Every structure is written in C-alpha cells, then in structure tokens.
Amino acid sequence: MINLRNAPPSILAAAMLIAVGAVFNFAMGLLLSLAPQLLAGIATPTTPSGAPAQLLLISGVACIIFGFVFVWIIKELFNKSHLAIVMIYTLSIINMLFGLFRLPLGLVTIFLNFLVIFLVRSESAKRWLSSN
C-alpha cells in the first residue's frame, strides 16, 4: 500500500501533471486507433508505393503505450524509486525536444515539462525521496 500522507505538495503536483499527460495519451491513442473515421478530413499518409500506411493506428498504439508508461512512472514515484526520477527526466527532455518541432503550441509542452522537472527537483521532494 502506498502511503501518500507525508508526500510533499511538489510530488503530488508532479504526479498530477503526469496523470494529466497519461489521460491525454490514452484519449489520443483511442481516438487515433479506434476512431479513424473521426479523422476523415486529415490526409492519410501513404507509403512510396501509394498504399495507405497504418500510421494513425501505430500512432494510437504508441500513445496508449506512453499512457501506461506514465501510470507506471506515477506508481514508481510514489514508491520513492530513483528509476522514476530518471524516467521523469528522460521523458521530459524528450517531450521538450519534440515540443520544439510544434512551436508555438509546443511552448505549452515545454513549460509543463520544465514545471514537472522543477517540482521533482525541489528540496521537499528530494528530502521525501531520500527518506525510507
């Protein structure tokens, strides 16, 4: 059983932001993989031979997998695992780099990932993560 009674607000806020990311990934994954008719107005990518690629389905499955990864990170964060911190840093940096490709909307992604890193690196979070 995970005891969050002593968790600092910075850890809870970081977990909440990661949970929002997980929900967003699950929603986008379901939209892309199960409801492609809703995206009928979007040009479907094709392979060089002209056959339609299953890029939307693959993107949807990848989003769902990332949603599960985010849930796993939250669980590990509440268990005070150092692997969770490494995963948070790694995925935040990757998300920020991909946010650069989507400017100006990517600025929101970059800001939220900086916020998660800032929250996890706070003094109260470091003390809580180092305690047994």
Name each region found by the language model.
Residues 1-132:
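Topology signature of small-to-medium multi-pass alpha-helical membrane proteins
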